[in-house]
Each structure stands twice: as structure tokens, then as C-alpha cells.
From Swiss-Prot:
It comes from Prochlorococcus marinus (strain AS9601). The gene is purA. Pathway: Purine metabolism; AMP biosynthesis via de novo pathway; AMP from IMP: step 1/2. Homodimer. The lineage of its organism: Bacteria, Bacillati, Cyanobacteriota, Cyanophyceae, Synechococcales. Keywords: Cytoplasm, GTP-binding, Ligase, Magnesium, Metal-binding, Nucleotide-binding, Purine biosynthesis. CDD domains: AdSS. HAMAP family: Adenylosucc_synth (MF_00011). IMP binds at residues 13-16, 38-41, 128, 142, 223, 238, 302. This is Adenylosuccinate synthetase. The active site is at 13 (proton acceptor), 41 (proton donor).
Length: 436
């Protein structure tokens, strides 16, 4: 038995959905522990493309329970669309469970999110406009609505009244937006609650019961390390904690329950939205990475910014998450390049540094110091074991492992499940360095 946390080791969009889907075959329970519909993951099964935002990837396995944990924020309208999409595709969703204490994204959260971002003008932070920040803000101010509140009409009317009055004041007086009606919201969200009620559970009790019964539990993070509210490139971050420590808070478990942490990183780097990005590329190589990697956001459809692999960020992710091993994704995107560069340090005001500056103003000033490696200029898409890889591809992976001082357990070479080299099963395999 092993309980494993899967986190993004960059700015999100690393391919966690595929890796979580892969590991879910060995898991009894998959728990999504933070974030909301601002995250998205794409899974390809039998040439069928499934895009999910809230429901854990493990839902595709009939005997796997999938829990949306207390640390998430849920837009019930979008969640129900996902449920309907899965049912339409013949997928059994009876294993889906939703924490009764998850907070709910309300209509005023979405409207305020968009209005506040527009009001920032040139100082925008790149929010998805899905209401995530305002939902978490209400949670922190103890003014939020939880899933359990949607199950009782009288309670829902009571808990919405005060926050709605406050939000209507903001909408009307500051942004000139028509106020929302209490009756309309209560009617709409009671309907959502009724449809979701059979999935609602006590999150902590459910997870601890699984642990007591020696079940394998997989904790699935959204976004990535550099988007963490406390440890990312603030203010260009999300409103929750995607790092491994967030799994304990968002799922309601102690750190001793976690056996292993696996980080997911692309073989290059991408970022969506605003904020510093030291290795960002311009021109033809950027376009090539974007086009070959289909670098468009699952949630927003925005074109992702692309750059070389950043080892400084990688080492920071290893440290802040306590990574045991790494899954490297989209290695195949680099197949056609004759030369590949990896950032090994930064130049900050004329000084070489090998650490990640947590001050975004300093990070903006950082210039990458690169190590050049030879490309392999042949397809890796059909490789299924390490010995199938071209020598220079192996050299590249070894260099990343040595630079980050962490073993590589999985290499992904395409969107499909079978386009993967599993060097070590992070759930059942022993802890050992296999590619380093």
C-alpha cells in the first residue's frame, strides 16, 4: 500500500491528468484536494478526448472511488455538465463523492472576478474569470456557501442573504452591474444540490476509512508549484495551495499518511497568463513548441507561453514539495530540434544565482544561464521502454534528473495512455533511483 501525491512542478498544464489517469489504475481512491474549474486536464482514451475540470481522472476506472475534497471550490453548474458528459460517454460515475464542506462558486463570484480583472487594466493578473479567487476570499472571510448548504432551502436562503447584499452593493455601486436576485439564486442552486446530493459525503471520514482498510490513495493536485498562493510567483498565482502540503489541508489528513510525492514536469516549460517567465522563447522555436505541444489552455483556450526547461524552478519544486520522483511529459515535442537548452542558473543584477527568487520583481530581472544539449531529431512517440529512446534523448533525461537531484519514474511521449514509459510504479514500486 502507498498513498501518493501528484503535483505540478512548474506553472501548471504539465500533463498531471494523464499521469494521474495512469496511476489511478493502481489506486483505490483518488482525491482532488484544491482548486476549482480554473484547472483543466485532458485525457485521451481509445482516441476519445475527455476534458475535465473538477472530477478526478480516476473516474475512468470503475472500481476507483473519486473524491472532490474539502479544499476545492465547486461550480455546481460546470460539475453537473462534466457528470452528464461522462454519462453520455458511457462512464460509470457511481464512485464520485463530493465533500459536504467544499465551498461553492456562486454567480456573483464569477461576475466579480471578471469585473475586478477588467478594472485592473494593465495590472491584470491573468485570472481565468471563473470566480475562483472571490470564492476563496469568501471562504477566508467565513462568508462562503458550502455544498451542504445546497441541500436545505431554509439554510441556503439564510447563508446567502448577507454575502449577496454585500456583493450586490459592489456590483451596483462600483462596477455599475445590475444586482442579482436572492430568489433566483436559491431556486437555481437548490436544484443543483438536489442533483448532487447522492454524491455528498464527509470527506475526512471517507478518506480515513479507506486508509484504515489499507487502500491505495492518490491525491491529485491542480495547477502547479509556481502558482501556489504562498510559494509561487505572487501575485501571479492561484488562490489555493497546489503544493504537496496542500493535500493534507485540502483532504483533511495528516502528513504521516503521505508515503510519496511525484512531481510532473514538461520536458520544456509553459505558462498561461501574466507574470515573469525567465526562459520564455520568442520566434520560430516558441511557435514550434506551441504547435507540436498543442499548447492551448483546457480551461481558457488561451495560447500558452513556451520556453526552455528551467532547472532552477525544477530544483525549487523538488524542495518545496519534497519530491521523491518525477514524471517528465511531452518529451516527443522536442523530437525535431537539433539543439535543446536547459536553464541551470540565473543572472540577477550581474550575480549568478542557482536558487529561485520568491520576489516576482527579482524574478523579472533574472536572465537564464543555459546549458546546451544535442537534440535527437527522430520520433520518440513509439518508444515503450528506455532502451528504445535515442541516445541523446536518454542523455537529456539524465541531465534533468542530475540537475534536479531526483529520479525520473515516468516518461510520457504523447497524449495516449500507451505512449508512456513507466520506469517505476510510484504506488507499488520500491523507492529507488532508476534514472538519475
Amino acid at each position: 500500500m502507498a498513498n501518493v501525491v501528484v503535483i505540478g512542478a512548474q506553472w501548471g498544464d504539465e500533463g498531471k491528468g494523464k499521469i494521474t489517469d495512469l496511476l489511478s489504475r493502481s489506486a483505490d481512491v483518488v482525491v482532488r484536494y484544491q482548486g476549482g474549474v480554473n484547472a483543466g486536464h485532458t485525457i485521451v482514451v481509445d482516441d476519445k478526448v475527455l476534458k475535465l475540470h473538477l472530477i478526478p481522472s480516476g473516474i475512468l476506472y470503475k472500481n476507483t472511488s473519486c473524491l472532490i475534497g474539502s479544499g476545492t471550490v465547486i461550480d455546481p453548474k460546470i460539475l453537473l455538465k462534466e457528470i452528464d458528459m461522462l454519462i453520455d460517454n458511457g462512464i460509470d460515475i457511481s464512485g464520485l463523492k463530493i465533500s459536504s464542506t467544499s465551498h461553492v462558486t456562486m454567480p456573483y463570484h464569477r461576475i466579480l472576478d471578471e469585473a475586478m480583472e477588467a478594472d485592473r487594466g494593465s495590472n491584470k493578473i491573468g485570472t481565468t474569470g471563473r470566480g475562483i479567487g472571490p470564492t476563496y476570499a469568501d471562504k477566508s472571510q467565513r462568508n462562503g456557501i458550502r455544498i451542504r448548504d445546497l441541500l436545505n432551502k431554509e439554510r441556503l436562503s439564510d447563508v446567502i442573504e448577507i454575502p449577496l447584499r454585500e456583493k450586490n452593493g459592489l456590483l451596483e455601486k462600483i462596477y455599475g452591474i445590475k444586482p442579482l436576485k436572492l430568489e433566483d439564486i436559491v431556486e437555481e442552486y437548490l436544484d443543483y444540490g438536489e442533483r448532487l446530493s447522492k454524491h455528498v459525503v464527509d470527506c475526512t471520514r471517507t478518506i480515513h476509512a479507506a486508509s484504515k482498510n489499507k487502500k491505495n490513495i492518490l491525491f491529485e493536485g491542480a495547477q502547479g508549484t509556481l502558482l501556489d498562493l504562498d510559494h509561487g510567483t505572487y501575485p501571479f498565482v492561484t488562490s489555493s495551495n497546489p503544493i504537496s502540503g496542500g493535500a493534507c489541508i485540502g483532504a483533511g489528513v495528516g502528513p504521516t499518511l503521505i508515503d510519496r510525492v511525484i512531481g510532473v514536469a514538461k520536458a520544456y516549460t509553459t505558462r498561461v497568463g501574466e507574470g515573469p517567465f525567465p526562459t520564455e522563447l520568442q520566434g520560430s522555436i516558441n511557435d514550434q513548441l506551441c504547435d507540436r505541444g498543442s499548447e492551448f489552455g483546457t480551461t481558457t483556450g488561451r495560447r500558452r507561453r513556451c520556453g526552455w526547461f528551467d532547472g532552477v524552478i525544477g530544483k525549487y519544486a523538488v524542495s518545496v514539495n519534497g519530491l521523491d520522483c518525477l514524471a517528465v511529459t511531452k518529451l516527443d515535442v522536442l523530437d525535431e530540434l537539433d539543439e535543446i537548452q536547459v536553464c541551470i542558473a540565473y543572472d540577477l543584477n550581474g550575480e549568478e544565482i542557482d536558487y529561485f527568487p520568491t520576489n516576482s520583481d527579482d524574478l523579472k530581472k533574472c536572465k537564464p544561464i543555459f546549458k546546451k544539449l544535442k537534440g535527437w531529431q527522430c520520433s520518440t512517440a513509439d518508444c515503450r521502454k528506455l532502451s528504445d529512446l535515442p541516445e541523446n534523448a536518454m542523455n537529456y533525461l539524465r541531465f534533468l534528473a542530475e540537475l534536479m537531484e531526483v529520479p525520473i519514474a515516468i516518461v510520457s511521449l504523447g497524449a495516449n495512455r500507451d505512449q508512456t514509459i513507466v520506469i517505476e510504479d510510484p504506488i507499488h514500486g520500491p523507492k529507488r533511483a532508476l534514472l538519475r
